[in-house]
Curated annotation (Swiss-Prot):
Quaternary state and interactors: Homodimer.
Enzymatic reactions: RX + glutathione = an S-substituted glutathione + a halide anion + H(+)
Domain GST N-terminal, chain residue ranges per copy: 2-83
Origin species: Fasciola hepatica
Subcellular location: Cytoplasm
Residues noted as binding substrate in the record, renumbered to the chain: Y111
PROSITE patterns tied to this protein: GST_CTER (PS50405), GST_NTER (PS50404)
Keywords: Cytoplasm, Transferase
Protein name: Glutathione S-transferase class-mu 26 kDa isozyme 51
Length: 218
């Protein structure tokens, strides 16, 4: 039975989950809530048997989960992506946390009502953050070496969203630029991005100051 996902009809926190499932070739069905579906979600929220009801959610024949990182870890664990030693598992957990920091730094700016005032400071600090990630990646193809793992999709999605705000941000970081292209060139990811299922925009909720409109910046 295909897993069931639920989220808003945006990229948001669910996009890395979608990318991971597509890469793994796992079948899933997704319920997408639109801009005007808040009442629909509130009607569903406490009637699905979720322990901690929220979006995104993931339901399969063995468990019902919310919280995007928990969902990612569960799927990754089923496919042996969480490491085989305490040291490997700790390192992967560290990357997960840093990946969420990367994304949430972007998100905080995007949802700030004073977006135009605060984005300058964010963009000023961005090269330092990207340099850290470039140094961490080093000469590896993927963040944990090889093959690709769930954390690669977390970092990829953050980088892809950030480039809408700073289109040239990766030009000084060729290793990150190559990493991003490497993810996009994975056959199943490439096919997904060319399909009708792929959500290119919006990046964030419709209430966001940036990344939440009906159309991407020109």
């Amino acid at each position: 039975m295909p897993a069931k996902l639920g989220y808003w009809k945006i990229r948001g926190l669910q996009q890395p989950v979608r990318l991971l499932l597509e890469y793994l070739g796992e079948e899933y069905e997704e319920h997408l809530y639109g801009r005007d579906d808040r009442e629909k979600w509130f009607g569903d929220k406490f009637n699905m048997g979720l322990d901690l009801p929220n979006l995104p959610y993931y339901i399969d024949d063995k468990c019902k989960l919310t919280q995007s990182v928990a969902i990612m870890r569960y799927i990754a664990d089923k496919h042996g992506m969480l490491g085989t030693t305490p040291e490997e598992r700790a390192r992967i957990s560290m990357i997960e946390g840093a990946a969420m920091d990367l994304r949430m730094g972007f998100v905080r700016v995007c949802y700030n009502p004073k977006f135009e005032e605060v984005k300058g400071d964010y963009l000023k600090e961005l090269p330092t953050t990207l340099k850290m990630w470039s140094n961490f990646l080093g000469d590896r193809h993927y963040l944990t070496g090889s093959p690709v793992s769930h954390v690669d999709f977390m970092v990829y999605e953050a980088l892809d969203c950030i480039r809408y705000l700073a289109p040239q941000c990766l030009e000084d970081f060729p290793k990150l630029k190559e990493f991003k292209s490497r993810i996009e060139d994975l056959p199943k990811i490439k096919a997904y991005m060319e399909s009708e299922k792929f959500i290119k925009w919006p990046l964030n909720s419709w209430i966001a100051s940036f990344g939440g409109g009906d159309a991407a910046p020109a």
